[in-house]
Regions:
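Short, hydrophobic/aliphatic alpha-helical segments
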Residues: 2-3, 237-254
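Active-site catalytic microenvironments for nucleophilic, acid-base chemistry
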Residues: 151-156, 215, 268-275
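Cytochrome P450 C-terminal heme-thiolate binding region
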Residues: 38, 45-58, 84, 203-218, ...
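Surface-exposed helix-capping loop/turn segments at secondary-structure junctions
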Residues: 128-135, 156-160, 214-224, 279-280, ...
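Cytochrome P450 catalytic-domain helical core, especially the substrate-recognition surface
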Residues: 6-34, 40, 45-48, 55-60, ...
Length: 358
């Protein structure tokens, strides 16, 4: 183990490299990987941080030594008002319990059953598109994924609420990166415009979720959606999820499920608009395999080029472009000593653009 600090950019006396990191996180991490190799060191204020830019090192953090690396508290404590203790934020035994409870809801057969819903809502979106029309496809993708997630998650058609929900999501999603990356953390109780927007967005989302939970408690029959599975799930002691636990999981799935998918689809549209030959080949495959009939889940194995297009878009523009983990105790990664309390960053954005792998 090399006891020295890995190479990295020099920083300011007090702030370290925080200004550059906060101003352009992807540009900064790309610079560190290019200039300093697979393991680089920088400081965020008084905290040590490391960028690991190799798939084997990511495997060390996320699998081999996963018990020594927790989800970054510095990040998650600023978003617990919205995510609570759902799968995205929880740790240890509680995370494992929640994961086991939720796992049956995500069985491939269960997910495949939602294919018809996805096609129906997509057709409804396309009915509103006109030839030659200019569209904000990101807004369209956010809307249709919100509708699909609402229907498949808790059998709710939110068309009447979608504009208000859209505003609530925008309030929350716009504020999350601001809360995480700003150098000076402002307490939630201070009524800044950002804090007020965030609280309004969280309150509106909670009102919707708790209203749905109350309706489902009053009529607990299985509706074939994910919420039915979550409500029916029992742990080894026979305990079900509480309303608060269900709320946390539903908000996590609602936010993460619709926003990340919408981002991936938006970048796919963007890339297709810049690569007409790829677009033409994709259209040909779709017409050859489907003609003009609606797609089904059974068609997916016969659409390899469509699969490749989406995966390439996600490679180039991964919705989860950086992950942070905190070391619980001193350890060794890639031959370098990582001290307890240090943060390690893994960036799919940077790794996916490394010519050694792609």
């Amino acid at each position: 183990v090399n006891p020295q600090i890995p190479p990295g950019p020099p920083g300011r006396f007090f702030l370290g490299n925080l200004p550059e990191f906060a101003r352009d996180i992807l540009g900064y991490l790309t610079f560190c990987a290019r200039e300093y190799g697979d393991v680089s060191h920088f400081r965020l204020g008084r905290y040590d941080a490391y960028l690991l830019n190799h798939p084997d090192l990511a495997d060390e953090v996320l699998r081999t030594q996963r018990e020594n690396f927790i989800k970054h508290r510095f990040f998650w404590r600023h978003v617990t008002a919205i995510f609570g203790t759902g799968l995205l934020t929880s740790e240890g035994d509680f995370w494992l319990r929640q994961r086991r409870l939720a796992a049956p809801a995500f069985h491939p057969d269960r997910i495949a059953a939602y294919g018809g819903t996805m096609v129906a809502y997509t057709d409804r979106l396309l009915d509103g598109w006109g030839d030659g029309e200019t569209r904000n496809v990101h807004e369209d993708m956010m809307r249709v994924t919100m509708e699909i997630v609402s229907k498949t998650l808790f059998d709710a058609d939110v068309e009447s609420d979608v504009e208000e929900l859209g505003r609530a999501f925008e309030m929350v999603l716009r504020e999350i990166p601001v809360r995480v990356h700003r150098p000076i953390k402002i307490p939630d109780w201070i009524p800044t415009p950002g804090n007020l927007r965030y609280r309004r967005g969280v309150r509106r989302l909670e009102e919707l979720v708790y209203r749905i939970l109350a309706e489902r408690r009053a009529d607990p029959r299985d509706r074939g959606d994910l919420l039915s599975m979550l409500m029916a799930a029992r742990d080894d002691d026979g305990n079900a999820m509480s309303d608060r636990q269900l709320r946390d999981e539903l908000v996590t799935l609602f936010l993460a499920g619709h926003e990340t998918t919408a981002i991936a689809l938006s970048w796919t549209w963007y890339l297709l608009s810049h690569h007409p030959l790829v677009k033409d080949r994709l259209v040909k495959e779709l017409f050859d395999q489907l003609g003009r009939r609606p797609a089904t889940v059974a068609d997916l194995p016969r659409l390899p080029f469509a699969d490749a297009v989406v995966k390439e878009a996600i490679r180039l523009y991964p919705p989860a472009y950086v992950l942070g983990r905190q070391a619980l105790s001193d350890c060794e990664i890639g031959g370098w000593a990582i001290p307890a309390g240090a943060t390690v960053y893994l960036s799919p954005w940077v790794m996916h653009r490394d010519s050694r792998w792609f």
